[in-house]
């Protein structure tokens, strides 16, 4: 998917990118490749692959969930900024917070935000477990996203505490995670969440499967969650 095909594909979904936004994506790609030589940000560096598997894939969440209705989003473990930075470029009104435990990624994201001229973006170098216990962030976000390989039960403990009551947690998975979801149901309920939607689709060109799960926050998360750093991964609630 080259930049023009990317622009056309988004237009077909109702997202019309301006010349400025296209330039932001171009600069994002160039910075990603340049910085990737110094630090391991991504295994994907071919232009067509980046536009498809990073940019388009990140934005695909907005085809199924109305992002114009959100004000604040938090991206947990965003790495090189996916999915939240491509979404922010398309929906500039969003206030975006990214939390990641690797300092070098924060350095990249700071430089990226400056280069792209992004406002209302904040980067936090922290463990998700600690961040979720921070009163300045706990239950403060309209939407929390995770595009991660961690199991659903682990992601639920790291992310649901950050969602405000009435807000949503959006999980982006490659393969369908029905079995994973069944195992995680106990944890999701315990943390105050309820699964309300599941969207399954094929990424264009390569036709690989993608899945989006929407979990609404119906009640507050008990104070003891998330547990200490490392515990959710070692001893997931299942």
Curated annotation (Swiss-Prot):
Pfam families: GidB. The keyword RNA-binding does not apply. InterPro entries: rRNA_ssu_MeTfrase_G, SAM-dependent_MTases_sf. Gene3D superfamilies: Vaccinia Virus protein VP39. Its main location: cytoplasm. Signal peptide: none annotated. GO terms for molecular function: rRNA (guanine-N7-)-methyltransferase activity. It is found in: Cytoplasm. The keyword Cytoplasm applies. S-adenosyl-L-methionine binds at residues 77, 82, 128-129, 147. GO terms for cellular component: cytosol. Keywords: Cytoplasm, Methyltransferase, rRNA processing, S-adenosyl-L-methionine, Transferase. Its EC number is 2.1.1.-. Belongs to the methyltransferase superfamily. RNA methyltransferase RsmG family. HAMAP family: 16SrRNA_methyltr_G. Specifically methylates the N7 position of guanine in position 535 of 16S rRNA. This is Ribosomal RNA small subunit methyltransferase G. The lineage of its organism: Bacteria, Bacillati, Bacillota, Bacilli, Bacillales.
């Amino acid at each position: 998917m080259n930049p023009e095909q990317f622009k056309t594909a988004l237009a077909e979904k109702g997202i019309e990118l301006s010349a400025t936004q296209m330039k932001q994506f171009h600069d994002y790609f160039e910075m990603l490749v340049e910085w990737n030589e110094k630090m391991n940000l991504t295994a994907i560096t071919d232009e067509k692959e980046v536009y498809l598997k990073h940019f388009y894939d990140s934005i695909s969440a907005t085809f199924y969930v109305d992002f114009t209705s959100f004000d604040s989003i938090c991206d947990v473990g965003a790495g090189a900024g996916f999915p939240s930075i491509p979404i922010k470029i398309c929906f500039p009104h969003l206030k975006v917070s990214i939390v990641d435990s690797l300092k070098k990624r924060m350095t990249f994201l700071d430089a990226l935000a400056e280069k792209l001229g992004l406002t209302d973006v904040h980067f936090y170098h922290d463990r998700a477990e600690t961040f979720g216990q921070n009163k300045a962030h706990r239950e403060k976000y309209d939407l929390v996203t995770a595009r991660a390989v961690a199991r659903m039960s682990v992601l639920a403990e790291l992310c649901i505490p950050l969602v405000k009551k009435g807000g949503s947690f959006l999980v982006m998975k490659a393969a369908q995670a029905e079995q994973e979801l069944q195992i995680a149901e106990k944890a999701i309920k315990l943390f105050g969440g309820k699964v309300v939607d599941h969207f399954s689709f094929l990424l264009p060109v390569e036709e690989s499967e993608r899945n989006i799960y929407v979990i609404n926050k119906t009640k507050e998360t008990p104070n003891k969650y998330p547990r200490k750093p490392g515990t959710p991964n070692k001893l997931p609630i299942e």
